[in-house]
Amino acid sequence: MTETDGFYRSREVLDPAEQYKMDHKRRGTALIFNHERFFWHLALPERRGTNADRDNPTRRFSELGFEVKCFNDLRAEELLLKIHEVSTSSHVDADCFLCVFLSHGEGNHIYAYDAKIEIQTLTGLFKGDKCQSLVGKPKIFIIQACRGSQHDVPLVPLDVVDHQTDKLDDNVTQVDAASVYTLPAGADFLMCYSVAEGYYSHRETVNGSWYIQDLSEMLARHGSSLEFTELLTLVNRKVSQRRVDFCKDPGAIGKKQVPCFASMLTKKLHFCPKPSK
């Protein structure tokens, strides 16, 4: 008797070049939740430089046709209300949806001004049973937050230690506190993280985070021409080539960072230019 491993053979021939439809009336809504300061009882440090992280992607996503809405230091109840409002709105005439969180993180939570919120509570509002007008459309979540307590060590330690001064205008590297876990979200979701799980996410106090800086640069160069997950791979490469030069923690000097993304997309994602009105 011959035994074989069972497998499923679909009769459907899949087109590897198939793309999401990007010919709707509008590109879609992009929400940016920016958190610089936190309620004192959380004992979380101020996130200097995060306003640059708000402004840079605002400009880039606007150029790609998104309607960008920015919110600063919202309380958890306010943030949930904004997310709920958008998830219950109609996206019938939109290509996709995008949401950016700039904050501290912990476990499977992200911090608002006064409390932490479970990320799956936020993404769950955009699943098919809750937001039918986004079924089959890309839902992109970008999370700039620390995800652990380790620095990525360079393989070739040829770094020169630079001494940091205490002037406010100096571009000092800091880290976002606590950790965020990689979370499943569902079909047509794309979860983008500033750093791989278990490692620090670096943020400069003047220029903003490494990840958002380099994501914004790649969007400016290739946002309308390159498939989006390929663009994210370029961002991974660019961030991985950075190192910490100025930091109050001498042990952080020379350390590295590598972002990551978890794609549940089912087609290629191109932000093709919209026709001029």
From Swiss-Prot:
Modifications made to the protein after synthesis: Phosphorylated by NUAK1; phosphorylation inhibits self-activation. Phosphorylation at Ser-240 by AMP-activated protein kinase (PRKAA1 or PRKAA2) inhibits autocleavage, preventing caspase activation, thereby preventing hepatocyte apoptosis.
Region (130's region): 108-125
Cellular compartment(s): Cytoplasm; Nucleus
Catalytic site positions: 104, 146
Lipid-conjugated positions (S-palmitoyl cysteine): 247, 260
GO molecular function, one term: endopeptidase activity
GO cellular component terms listed in the entry, alphabetical order: axon; cytoplasm; cytosol; neuronal cell body; nucleus
A Pfam match: Peptidase_C14
Keyword Cytoplasm: yes
Keywords carried by this UniProt record: Apoptosis, Autocatalytic cleavage, Cytoplasm, Hydrolase, Lipoprotein, Nucleus, Palmitate, Phosphoprotein, Protease, Thiol protease, Zymogen
Residues annotated with Phosphoserine modification: 62, 240
Tri-arginine exosite, as annotated region: 25-27
Top-level taxon: Eukaryota
Propeptide residues according to the Swiss-Prot or TrEMBL record: 1-5, 163-176
PANTHER family reported for this sequence: CASPASE (PTHR10454), CASPASE-6 (PTHR10454:SF206)
Family: Belongs to the peptidase C14A family.
Domain notes per entry: The N-terminal disordered prodomain is required to prevent self-activation. The Tri-arginine exosite is required to recruit substrates for hydrolysis.
Protein name listed in UniProt: Caspase-6
Species for this entry: Rattus norvegicus
Gene name linked to the record: Casp6
